From Swiss-Prot:
Regions crossing the membrane: none
Matches recorded under NCBIfam families: GSH_gloB
Binding site for Zn(2+) 2: D57, H58, D127, H165
Cofactor: Zn(2+)
Native organism taxonomy: Bacteria, Pseudomonadati, Pseudomonadota, Gammaproteobacteria, Enterobacterales
GO MF annotations, alphabetized: hydroxyacylglutathione hydrolase activity; metal ion binding
Enzymatic class: hydrolase
Cofactor binding note: Binds 2 Zn(2+) ions per subunit.
Pathway, per record: Secondary metabolite metabolism; methylglyoxal degradation; (R)-lactate from methylglyoxal: step 2/2
Name of the protein described by the UniProt record: Hydroxyacylglutathione hydrolase
Keywords noted in UniProt: Hydrolase, Metal-binding, Zinc
One matching Pfam family: Lactamase_B
Assembly and binders: Monomer.
């Protein structure tokens, strides 16, 4: 499989995953023109569109893409039914595309019906998990979002995490502010600062890396609990997550 990231809008990434037969899936097309250009430049024929949630920066290009490929199936959660989805999927479903299987994982929090797609080693997680961070909680609860991220954390270290936004640098600055003496965060902040100065992408990431530099995956660690709570022995992991997310919202 070959993975292509397509910069779109202000800081989005649309993902293309293709096989050796030059067929591909399009994930979260927030706008159409960069997708159509990428398909043309790489001589790819789309087999389907996969949607993770209903926000316009993830679905805004669907209708125009369908104008060019009118029979293209569009998979998504129930909340995307009005956004062009023709096949509604949920936890436990598998989608057969590219002679392969994409497992559907429900990850509510950012939106109430948010899903992710997993085709080892690739995880398309929309706005649930970011590099060094996680999505804002618009429709779900902090506990829901924590549990969704814990689902993702069960996947292998070599999972290729395909996030939908270029937020890595700001997330690392926040993490470094919370935990300035963490060597992994400090080192990766320096690396990503250099990458972004060259306008290069920081994505995709891997779950193994995120376990080290993403505080939202480290809410069980007592040292982190001491950073954000006066009663670290008595706070539950999801409450650590809630406090971290609240601090990030104000950062």
């Amino acid at each position: 499989m070959n993975l292509i990231s397509i910069p779109a809008l202000q800081d989005n990434y649309i993902w293309l995953l293709s096989n050796k037969a030059n067929r591909c899936v399009i994930v979260d097309p927030g706008e159409a023109s960069p997708v159509l250009n990428a398909l043309d430049q790489n001589a790819l024929l789309p087999e389907a569109i996969l949607l993770t949630h209903h926000h316009n920066d993830h679905v805004g290009g669907v209708s125009e893409i369908l104008n060019h490929y009118p029979n293209l199936p569009v998979f998504g959660p129930k909340e995307t039914a009005k956004c062009g989805a023709t096949y509604l999927v949920e936890e436990g479903n598998t989608v057969s595309l590219l002679n392969s299987e994409f497992s559907v994982i429900e990850v509510p929090g950012h939106t109430s019906g948010h899903i992710a797609y997993y085709n080892a080693p690739f995880l398309f997680c929309g706005d649930t998990l970011f590099s060094a961070g996680c999505g804002r909680i618009f429709e779900g609860t902090p506990k829901q979002m924590y549990e969704s991220i814990q689902k993702i954390a069960e996947l292998p270290d070599d999972t290729v995490v395909c996030c939908a936004h270029e937020y890595t640098l700001s997330n690392l600055r926040f993490s470094n502010d919370i935990w300035p003496e963490d060597p992994d965060i400090e080192s990766y902040l320096h690396k990503i600062s250099q990458i972004r100065e060259k306008s290069q992408s920081s994505l995709p990431t891997t779950l193994g890396l995120e376990r080290r530099i993403n505080l939202f995956l480290r809410c069980h660690e007592i040292d982190l609990k001491r950073k954000i709570s006066n009663e670290p022995e008595n706070i539950e992991n999801w409450q650590v997550f809630k406090m971290l997310r609240s601090k990030k919202d104000c950062f």
